[in-house]
Amino acid sequence: MDAIRIERLSKTFPNGRKGLEDIDLAIAPGEMVALIGASGSGKSTLLRQIASFSSSDARPSRIDIFGRSIQRDGRIARDVRRMRRDIGFVFQQFNLVDRLSVETNVLIGALARVPMWRRLAGRFSRADRALAAQALGEVGIAEHARERAANLSGGQQQRAALARALVQRARIILADEPIASLDPAASRRVMEMLRALNANHRLTVLVSLHQIDVALRFCPRVVALRAGRIVYDGPSAALTRERLHALYGDDAHLPFAVGDEVRPAAREAAGEPARRAPAAFDSAGSPDLPDSQPASPRRMLAASSMR
């Protein structure tokens, strides 16, 4: 059974622009997959469709999460909120509530599986708090649990979002440009944490990235989008400069500045020892712009709780 299965998915925006066109994609449980493409290629749109934040075109299509249909033929499943419990969504914009403590922000992940009266009262059990403490320790920010989220750096806020996904007990993490606004050191830590969660918890990870070097280092498989279509789906080791130019033409050098030819993710998948990260990762490029406008804080909080 696939963790994510998509068949014939298309998405047209109200202005008539095609966001996605005939997407077919299957991701197995425990895979770590990079989603790459220029701004506007459909990366964010695809991730939001998988989470069913909006419906696809009304035509034969389907999105299944662990064998259950979350969206079919342009209609979102009635029990979509229940199904979203399996999905932890990490936004590019840090979607924490600034005035709340880091611990409380992480505990929001537990809201989807607690009784309604506890949701309304905002009461969390000792077990929930113990799980939050464990998750914060796992992502390396346990000492900030009682601080306001506003005091965290960008990289720490993204790690708090990952801790929230652990408290949510998500089986899939969808990360939409999680390092686009971070400095190189913070970017590396967030990606290392995603890889650790993938390895230690066998979480399925689909992460959209703007830097090809990062995709090659951390993800054994790459899915490339161009103008809403999948133009490559295969091992990161096969994604050479020549292949990139064939896929993206003269635009290949703009969003995809490949450093050297080191591809640790591909080597590790083949059982070979990893090497040092590409130099280009140490000097990551400028932040990407999201495919769509970020949601308001209230909408992001509602989405993050997956209630």
From Swiss-Prot:
It is a peripheral membrane protein. It catalyses: phosphonate(out) + ATP + H2O = phosphonate(in) + ADP + phosphate + H(+). The lineage of its organism: Bacteria, Pseudomonadati, Pseudomonadota, Betaproteobacteria, Burkholderiales. It is an enzyme of class 7 (translocase). This is Phosphonates import ATP-binding protein PhnC. The keyword Membrane applies. The gene is phnC. ATP binds at residues 37-44. The keyword Membrane applies. It comes from Burkholderia pseudomallei (strain K96243). The complex is composed of two ATP-binding proteins (PhnC), two transmembrane proteins (PhnE) and a solute-binding protein (PhnD).
